[in-house]
Amino acid sequence: DYTNIGHQGYLTDPDTLELLEKMQFKSERLGNVMSGAHRMEPILRDADLVSFDASSIRASDHAAHSEAGPNGLDAVTACQLARYAGMSDRVKSIGFFEHNPDLDQRNLGAQLMAQLIWHALDGIYAQKADIPKCSLDEYTKYVIDLDEVNQDVIFHKSPRSDRWWMEVPA
């Protein structure tokens, strides 16, 4: 599974987005991320690998990149996303890429990269180890009956973290 977080629609080739959709991959627009970074937590919670490209951060917050532009993630949102990535009980690798020290006039970009790493580590230390693996006995179960499709939607809520999971029918 692959998810791209923070693409800018007017800079992204529509054929690329169409290909991602055909491959059943996801891509979240920058506007969706900026209007509520917390909505990215379930996506990042399920991540095994996170690659964070500095070019996704707007130039006013991180100019140490040759492709820096006026729009992108702000530093606060980037740090929130890094923490969510660290909080994933599944994550095996988090990488921060495309910082260019030669373009970092006042070392502000390096400071932001350090903050991103700190937030990812803070997320790792905040992991709850509550991924439902085998037994769901500890979890609160919620069943939503969808009469229109003759299907139940089942949610499980962790008593440890108050995080939710949804059962996906086979």
Residue ranges and their predicted role:
Residues D1-M23:
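Glycine-rich phosphate/diphosphate-binding loop of Rossmann-like nucleotide-binding domains
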Residues L19-K22, K26-A170:
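Catalytic cores of soluble, metal-dependent hydrolases
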